[in-house]
Amino acid sequence: MKSAVLFLLGIIFLEQCGVRGTLVIRNARCSCISTSRGTIHYKSLKDLKQFAPSPNCNKTEIIATLKNGDQTCLDPDSANVKKLMKEWEKKISQKKKQKRGKKHQKNMKNRKPKTPQSRRRSRKTT
């Protein structure tokens, strides 16, 4: 009985607070109307995002954001774009490795040096 009352009070409380579940959708339609087959060097990229097909858009979309802020839709079937995606993924994985390496170096600096067992033991003087 107590658990049912507490459950109902919890539901009423959440309702009063305005907690609602909402569906988050990227867009109600495809973001890319047309695509570019032109070549973009991966060093000029700021970001590269790939969106899988969804109920609202039945095609794979790749959106490149350049360092100057321009956004371009790329053709996912193009050989140049596939190569660009591989280079971008390689660049991102290298950045993650560097970040992990810096974190490891920082942890190593914060550690106290270990002393040998012989130094820890108290020596008897005779």
Swiss-Prot record:
Classification via Pfam families: IL8
Region (Disordered) location: 91-126
Comp. bias intervals (Basic residues): 93-126
BP GO terms, sorted: adenylate cyclase-activating G protein-coupled receptor signaling pathway; chemotaxis; defense response to virus; immune response; inflammatory response; positive regulation of myoblast differentiation; positive regulation of myoblast fusion; positive regulation of release of sequestered calcium ion into cytosol
Sugar-modified residues: N58
Function as written in the Swiss-Prot or TrEMBL entry: May be a cytokine that affects the growth, movement, or activation state of cells that participate in immune and inflammatory response.
Protein name: C-X-C motif chemokine 9
